[in-house]
Regions:
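Extended, histidine- and acidic-residue-enriched regions that form the cofactor-binding/catalytic faces
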Residues: 3-117
Length: 117
């Protein structure tokens, strides 16, 4: 039965990132926490490293007003996310920061997969 052979691994790409790398990535703006990093410094920096042609810096906005919630609720209240979808600023993003992130987590993610599969 395939159910007996299937294996699923759930991991966040940022979990193996050392604290000192987080400090380097966020040396210009405060680290807002992973819940707020959607379309912010880390994800934008990764896109600048992987596919810079897809990053439109002129569209970056500074967002204010999103507040952390210690739980999840569905459906998500309409006022929980600003209209831009951005929860934290991306203004200090760079391809160099993206490469720093890649270099710090990729090998660790491969090790996790090698161990489990």
């Amino acid at each position: 039965c395939i159910r007996d052979r299937a294996k699923i691994l759930i991991a966040n790409w940022w979990d193996p990132m050392p604290a000192e790398i987080i400090d380097k990535v966020f040396d210009e703006v405060p680290f807002p926490g992973w819940a707020f990093e959607h379309a912010a410094v880390t994800e934008t920096s990764l896109m600048m490293a992987f596919a810079p042609e897809l990053v439109h810096e002129e569209r970056m906005v500074d967002t204010q007003g999103a507040t952390p919630c210690p739980y999840h609720i569905y459906p998500v209240p309409k006022d929980a996310v600003p209209p831009t979808g951005v929860l934290a600023p991306a203004r200090s993003s760079s391809a160099a920061r993206g490469q720093l992130i890649i270099d710090s987590v990729l090998d660790e993610l491969v090790k996790i997969c090698d161990k489990e599969f």
